[in-house]
Amino acid sequence: MAMEIGEDEWKVCCGSSEFAKQMSTSGPLTSQEAIYTARDIWFNQVNVTDWLEAFSAHPQIGNTPSPSINSDFARRSVSEQSTAFATTSASALQELAEWNVLYKKKFGFIFIICASGRTHAEMLHALKERYENRPIVELEIAAMEQMKITELRMAKLFSDKAKVISETDSSSSPVSTKPQDRLRIIGGHLNVAAEAKAPKRSRPPITTHVLDVSRGAPAAGVEVHLEVWSGTTGPSFVHGGGGVWSSVGTSATDRDGRSGPLMDLVDALNPGTYRISFDTAKYSPGCFFPYVSIVFQVTESQKWEHFHVPLLLAPFSFSTYRGS
């Protein structure tokens, strides 16, 4: 069911004013449409200042929220850290507080992690591990963690609003007893589910960008090639398997490090095994890696999702992750 949600409600999901404003003007949205819209706004529309505003709305991990913070936001933060508070001690909280100070001094913003279901030890380990990152890499990771938090809060928001609507309808509408009425209601639910499952895309389902972490800047002019595996069996780790890689599309990164379209704009992505390759030698002749290839799978249940597969490149190392 598509819902109209106000700016204040969106700001409980994410502390960025610009994010909340853009989400409120994008509705009405179904829960699935809201996820795709939120990801697009967060990663492609708002700027770094908006990211930092969202980060600053959170209490530091291990701390209770300040009374000055929005009460609904504060209650969510306490709930999300409940597992951590239940698995810690005074001395452990002190160690976490000390690492929080070190982290903020290095990066300029507080440590952001999707705390829901995580123990104190897990979060402290993640903090220590991420402390070693370069600032520009850590900023991206923090933005991704914020999106995870936002999506969890959005799911709760839609669930709560749907419950209110359901209770209102059941108290104000007569009970339908005719078989044809029951069929009409069931059909309506099925149609809503189908609509929610197939949101209209605003960009191709597979995208990428390249970040040169040695310079702390986007890598422009990197040739990118996307392929899909064609064969009766999947590709083998050693021998390649019974099939071939078929070209889907080629592009190059722009000054922001983002590639052009690598495939057509389709709503449903064909399930299968994909390979995205980067001509790193042409971009950086002294690079240890002449090219980088990343292989990933898309299942039937994921065909409506977006796959952002970036490359974080340095002369002697690289990393990747699945973004949104």
UniProtKB/Swiss-Prot annotation:
InterPro entries on file: HIU_hydrol/OHCU_decarb, Hydroxyisourate_hydrolase, OHCU_decarboxylase, OHCU_decarboxylase_sf, Thyroxine_BS, Transthyretin/HIU_hydrolase, Transthyretin/HIU_hydrolase_d, Transthyretin/HIU_hydrolase_sf
Positions contributing to (S)-allantoin binding: 58-59, 80, 111, 113, 115
Pathway noted in the entry: Purine metabolism; urate degradation; (S)-allantoin from urate: step 2/3; Purine metabolism; urate degradation; (S)-allantoin from urate: step 3/3
Classification via Gene3D superfamilies: Oxo-4-hydroxy-4-carboxy-5-ureidoimidazoline decarboxylase, Transthyretin/hydroxyisourate hydrolase domain
GO terms classed as biological process: allantoin biosynthetic process; brassinosteroid mediated signaling pathway; cold acclimation; protein tetramerization; purine nucleobase metabolic process; regulation of brassinosteroid mediated signaling pathway; regulation of cell growth by extracellular stimulus; regulation of seedling development
EC annotation from Swiss-Prot or TrEMBL: 4.1.1.97, 3.5.2.17
Residue numbers spanned by region HIU hydrolase: 178-324
Highest taxon listed in the record's lineage: Eukaryota
Topology in the lipid bilayer: Peripheral membrane protein
Consequences of knocking out this gene: Longer hypocotyls and roots, as well as greater fresh weight due to plant growth promotion. Enhanced sensitivity to brassinosteroid (BR) in term of plant growth regulation. Increased freezing tolerance to cold treatment. The double mutant b1l ttl exhibits a developmental phenotype and freezing tolerance comparable to the single mutant ttl.
Active site per database record: 58 (proton donor)
Post-translational events: Phosphorylated by BRI1 in vitro.
Record PTM N-acetylalanine, positions in chain: 2
Location of this chain's protein in the cell: Cell membrane; Peroxisome
Region (OHCU decarboxylase): 2-161
Transmembrane segments: none
Keywords in alphabetical order: Acetylation, Cell membrane, Cytoplasm, Decarboxylase, Hydrolase, Lyase, Membrane, Multifunctional enzyme, Peroxisome, Phosphoprotein, Purine metabolism
Region (Required for BRI1-binding): 2-29
Chain location of the short sequence motif Internal peroxisomal targeting signal (PTS2) per the record: 182-190
Catalytic activity: 5-hydroxyisourate + H2O = 5-hydroxy-2-oxo-4-ureido-2,5-dihydro-1H-imidazole-5-carboxylate + H(+); 5-hydroxy-2-oxo-4-ureido-2,5-dihydro-1H-imidazole-5-carboxylate + H(+) = (S)-allantoin + CO2
Induction (record text): Not regulated by plant steroids.
Function summary: Involved in the last two steps of the degradation of uric acid, i.e. the hydrolysis of 5-hydroxyisourate (HIU) to 2-oxo-4-hydroxy-4-carboxy-5-ureidoimidazoline (OHCU) and its stereoselective decarboxylation to (S)-allantoin, a major ureide compound. Might function as a negative regulator to modulate brassinosteroid-mediated plant growth. Together with B1L, prevents plant growth and development, but by opposition to B1L, negatively regulates cold tolerance, probably in a brassinosteroid (BR) and allantoin-dependent manner.
Comment block on domains: The N-terminal 29 amino acids are essential, but not sufficient, for the interaction with BRI1.
Assembly mode: Homodimer. Forms tetramers. Interacts with BRI1 in a kinase-dependent manner. Interacts with B1L.
Family classification: In the N-terminal section; belongs to the OHCU decarboxylase family. In the C-terminal section; belongs to the transthyretin family. 5-hydroxyisourate hydrolase subfamily.
Protein name: Uric acid degradation bifunctional protein TTL
Organism: Arabidopsis thaliana
GN (gene name): TTL
